Amino acid sequence: LVGNDDAVILDSQVHDSVQTAVQFLRNRDVRVEVIRHNRLDMLESRIKALKDNYRKIWYMADGVYSMQGDFAPVKDLFRLADQYEQLHLYLDDIHGMSWAGPNGTGWVLGQGEYHPRLYLTTGLTKAFGSAGGLLIYPDEKEYQLIKNTSKAFIFSIQMPPMVLGATAASARIHLSPEIYSLQEEMQTKVEYFNRRAKELQLPLINESISPIGFIGVGKPDTGYNMVRRMMNQGYYFNLSVFPSVSYNNTGLRIPLNRLHTFEDIDGLLTEIATQLPQALEDSHSSMSEIYKHFKLVA
């Protein structure tokens, strides 16, 4: 997709899989830049600076960001693409799949009409419940180009039968009215998670409608301490730590799913509220340091 006379601009928090793929472009001396997270003013400034010297300008970002569950400003990106014809959008929406969008097609596709310069990647390995990737192109020509020249297509194999069966079963749910009742149920649990976290005065970094909760703990030492403490209480979740996030932006990454009960959510958050002050004391840190590192208002 990206030619030698194109330029690439990465959001600083775009998924590592995209950043890794871009390393192949660097080997071809393709110009690659990184801008601060969701800073469309910086994006527009770089478009203006690059547009006279490059054929296409690619902006690569996530639809829903994997660490803190926040969103790309999709509608604003579409407006920017309307304004600058050279701008092409490459968005990874795997974390927006199923729980959002019409028929569970994802966060990005739930934001309006498909933009003619949008290249969308998503996948079946998260909320969809099976395995495999999805690539959506603006026209048949681009589709045929990738299908017939991409190493990933040329050298990959077909889905194993059991994965294909799970994919077909999930697709039938997505194509039925059932998907909307499942999405609604998921949202009630996300809302409950956000509400209880606030009631317990936990440092919830984004009060997001996405099912990725992120409770900031600051230092990596505090994060590792919290994981050990919570495992001892029977709770397991991801720790977001450097280099996935900035060094002092360690956090407890808590992906919710529909099978979690309200009691599960309440028990988890209550235990975090109990253990966090002790973990902070152990690492000679404090809640005020968490608020400082994440630029939160107490």
Q: Where do the PLM segments sit?
A:
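Active-site PLP attachment segment
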Residues: 109-145
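Active-site phosphate-binding strand-loop segment of PLP-dependent enzymes
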Residues: 30-90
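Conserved PLP-binding catalytic core of the aspartate aminotransferase-like
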Residues: 180-194, 200-233, 244, 248-252, ...
